[in-house]
């Protein structure tokens, strides 16, 4: 019987931690200044050093969506969700981007996942209800 092996987690040096934190702060501040392209660039630096940094993936996705780069945003949300599947806001924001792409069925599925994790998520509830209410009568088109 083969034994399943797992890849050991990378242990970061203090210097690497400092670099990740520096790049993350720069990215976050660029986002606050609405310099989304610059923010994405710095989130890429974070991800290059720490590929499991789910908050960097999530923030990068959000900033890509603000740049109307929806496909790239969805891909980043997918990574963030894979790394941290219990945060309902990840599913909600992915659903919102899918709405912008007129992918209503997929958006509702994301809102449903979000509501499984957090039944009180107002944003997911509101947009899910809005989509369901307007499906079929072309109010979104």
Where are the language model's segments positioned?
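Conserved structural position within tetratricopeptide repeats
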Residues: 47-48, 79-82, 115-116
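Helix-start (N-cap) detector for alpha-helical repeat units in TPR-like alpha-solenoids
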Residues: 20, 54-55, 88-89, 122-123
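Alpha-helical segment of the N-proximal tetratricopeptide repeat
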Residues: 17-49, 66
């Amino acid at each position: 019987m083969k034994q399943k092996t797992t890849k050991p987690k990378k242990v970061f040096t203090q210097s690497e931690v400092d670099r990740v934190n520096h790049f993350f702060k720069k990215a976050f501040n660029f986002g606050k200044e609405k310099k989304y392209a610059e923010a994405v660039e710095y989130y890429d630096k974070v991800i290059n050093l720490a590929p499991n940094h789910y908050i960097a993936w999530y923030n990068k996705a959000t900033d890509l969506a603000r740049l109307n780069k929806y496909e790239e945003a969805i891909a980043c949300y997918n990574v963030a969700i894979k790394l941290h599947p219990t945060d309902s806001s990840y599913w909600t924001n992915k659903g919102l981007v899918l709405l912008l792409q007129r992918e209503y069925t997929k958006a509702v599925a994301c809102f449903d996942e979000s509501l499984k994790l957090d039944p009180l998520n107002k944003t997911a509830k509101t947009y899910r209800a809005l989509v369901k209410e307007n499906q079929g009568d072309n109010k979104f088109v």
